[in-house]
Amino acid sequence: MSEMTPREIVHELDAHIIGQKKAKRSVAVALRNRWRRMQLDADFRQEVTPKNILMIGPTGVGKTEIARRLAKLANAPFIKVEATKFTEVGYVGKEVEQIIRDLTDIAIKLTREQQMGKCRQRAEEHAEERILDALLPKPKNDWDNTDSDTSSNTRQIFRKKLREGQLDDKEIDIDVAQPQVGIEIMSPPGMEEMTNQLQSLFKNMGQAPAKRRKMKIKEAFKLLIEEEAAKLVNQEDLKEQAIELVEQHGIVFLDEIDKICKRGETSGPDVSREGVQRDLLPLVEGCTVTTKHGMVKTDHILFIASGAFQMAKPSDLIPELQGRLPIRVELDALSADDFKRILTEPHASLTEQYIALMATEGVTIEFAESGIESIAKAAWQVNERTENIGARRLHTVMEKLMEDISYEASDKSGSSFVIDADYVSAHLDNLVQDEDLSRFIL
């Protein structure tokens, strides 16, 4: 789990997301509170529940990007899901409990990687012995072993060469475990546990024996380390730790929650909107979900919901769900100045990406200050006159601007281009000023 302070978390988010200080502060405090809670006594800890967050803001201002970056910082089970992918229990479609099952699978993978990392040294030793056995096979008959000292010395010589990398390109025949092939079984509602058991049964039945393969020692060493590390991991301990990790540190990001708001009066069951909200209630409030790894309690899982709320309002959510999302954060619409900062300030910004891509063809690109201002202004104007899609408009504008250079780059190795205000004007002015063209091209 991340032990970063709120200030450090905001600083990390600043490297990728422009503006939106309120949203950054809220998620930073929520993430830090996960760590603070774990410092409390076990009895008192159970009484401290997470304060779930609802992020409200137009499309393209950074809601989803905050989730993506938070996932990397959290160092805890994290899943991002679209609320529109689910339907009410009993109808065709995914049930909301699948969110927790997927989150548990992520925790299993995360815990397995951590445990395999702890026993990596032992795994390397075992892998090394297997490679030496392949290089220096033991004699088939005991009477062939005439000089054990000589054999031992030879093994030590090869061990030294192996560790120094002198044998990396040598090919050997080695027995490698075959990857297991899973079988997907569609289950009727309420029978997920039976489906999981059937999947496990078929998976075990389909285990293929180890297959002898010819490969270079460097490649074989990596495969054997993974195989040996997997053998050293205790599967029961792994499941217990993963479930504990989900229950205490799990984070669920529910995107597009505004799309499941009820709009106006409708006849018949609203299975993909209000029905989904009703099914989400017990998850957010706290319930027990059955997974193939065991029972998972959701009482202390942090839920962060987000939506544009252009066609609906937060008050259109059912009251019970509103009450379970107590912290509200509004994200601001982006200005032309924000667009300019987005083009230059973040790590691996759009301009840096195009410079690096064209450099692979031997073409030098330079973005002048005037050019960056013109690009930002053009994107902002198109957003104002047509649909406002936020920073995503920059991708469209930049791709149109760089279209000719990208097409001809392979034939112009050694060339240099300066993207200034004149260049931007020549390539974008007609599109920006013509509203019909803007709607279809930008």
Curated annotation (Swiss-Prot):
Biological process according to GO: protein unfolding; proteolysis involved in protein catabolic process
Q: Where does ATP bind?
A: 18, 60-65, 255, 320, 392
Spell out the molecular function terms from Gene Ontology: ATP binding; ATP hydrolysis activity; peptidase activity; proteasome-activating activity
Q: Which InterPro entries does the UniProt entry name for this protein?
A: AAA+_ATPase (IPR003593), ATP-dep_Clp_protease_ClpX (IPR050052), ATPase_AAA_core (IPR003959), Clp_ATPase_C (IPR019489), HslU (IPR004491), P-loop_NTPase (IPR027417)
Keywords from the named record:
ATP-binding, Chaperone, Cytoplasm, Nucleotide-binding, Stress response
An example of a Pfam family matching this protein is AAA_2
Taxonomy, superkingdom:
Bacteria
Looking at the UniProt record for this protein, which Gene Ontology cellular component terms does it annotate, in alphabetical order?
HslUV protease complex
SUPFAM superfamilies associated with the record: P-loop containing nucleoside triphosphate hydrolases
Indicate the quaternary assembly: A double ring-shaped homohexamer of HslV is capped on each side by a ring-shaped HslU homohexamer. The assembly of the HslU/HslV complex is dependent on binding of ATP.
User: What HAMAP family does the record point to?
Assistant: HslU (MF_00249)
What's the protein here called? Answer: ATP-dependent protease ATPase subunit HslU
Q: What is the lineage of its organism?
A: Bacteria, Pseudomonadati, Pseudomonadota, Gammaproteobacteria, Alteromonadales
